[in-house]
């Protein structure tokens, strides 16, 4: 037998005899390691949340470094600079809020603050960095504090229900809410409404049954009830290179009915 044959024979017999026992032993020993890692991660997340409670970091070095990358060229999309303190309401949500992130938040010299789901702050590694990226928990008191400190606030009013609605790929479907309107009124700042044409085409999603029921239940539970398979650029997790068009309109104090009436007109503009 040649050396290569002996080597092949050794590998095959090793796998045949030892692979299953090693997998079983590895699985058994990985359970305590996973529990320890999870416990440490949760403790770190809780400590950071307590330590940085109410802290707003719109100009952290990590965000400045990430903003140097021309993210808007990926799709491509136009960019919007927010000059005055305002509530920037972006529609629709889509999967990743690509228009809001690439076209407004991660733009060089942008000082906006992005409202995200509070649970993100407890995700290991990502949650430890998300505040340094200019994000705050989407809680009314913290959002109001940010506005009173002079920071423009990016909100995606449709939230989780609108993420579920993006299954159908229709940018014009919105889940109406009024909390951000009350917020702007209380802080006495205008609303900058932004419509992102093409947002729902950045990913292909599986159209599961009971769509209307899942949208309603997602709103109640604040959990996106969708099949966790998002196909982007060439089937990867990257968003598709779909051109995005950001349209914007400034609105002063308004009601929910008036706001969504203005939004429909903005959506229809060419």
Identify the residue ranges that each predicted region occupies.
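A short, well-structured juxtamembrane/interface segment
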Residues: 61-84
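Compositionally biased, charge-rich terminal segments
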Residues: 1-4, 44-57, 202-217
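Short, conserved catalytic or adaptor-binding loops enriched in Gly and charged residues
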Residues: 63-69, 106-107, 129, 238-239
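Catalytic core of membrane glycerolipid acyltransferases/transacylases, capturing the structured
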Residues: 41-60, 81-149, 160-175
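A residue-level signal for beta-strand positions that form part of recognition/binding surfaces
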Residues: 71, 85, 111, 152, ...
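Catalytic cores of glycan-processing enzymes that make or break glycosidic bonds
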Residues: 34-46, 65, 111, 124, ...
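Non-catalytic C-terminal accessory region of glycerolipid acyltransferases
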Residues: 145-270
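Alpha-helical bilayer-embedded segments of polytopic membrane proteins, i.e.
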Residues: 1-45
